Amino acid sequence: MANLYVIKIGGNIIDDSAKLDAFLQSFAAVDGKKILVHGGGKLATRMAEKLGVEQQLVDGRRITDAETLKIVTMVYAGYINKNIVATLQANHCNAMGLCGADGDAILAHKRNHPVLDYGYVGDVDAINADLLTVLLEK
């Protein structure tokens, strides 16, 4: 596939609505096929605090227990993802939001650490390129 761009944005952009809007306008203007991968910044932590779910971070990495997994899924795959899709659509960039579980887009295994159990945190094993190719070609 010619001209496929895969761009990952992190919390620095996600947490700043002006930066996010400016980035998404620029991203929408890029010609060619593109995939945007995003995290959730501090929003998941703030939501967990509002819901009374204590968060554990070790060296900036989240320890994800069952309740935190629900919140992270809600925030990342729900609110943030759909906000990004809506903003891209408003900028005339046809967009679709997926999470890694959708269509087995991302296959992963539980993160193995010699001392620390990160809970429901995983490391990527494979990307379902066939699925992404079908979606990008439509």
Locate the predicted segments by residue.
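Nucleotide/pyrophosphate-binding catalytic subdomain
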Residues: 1-138
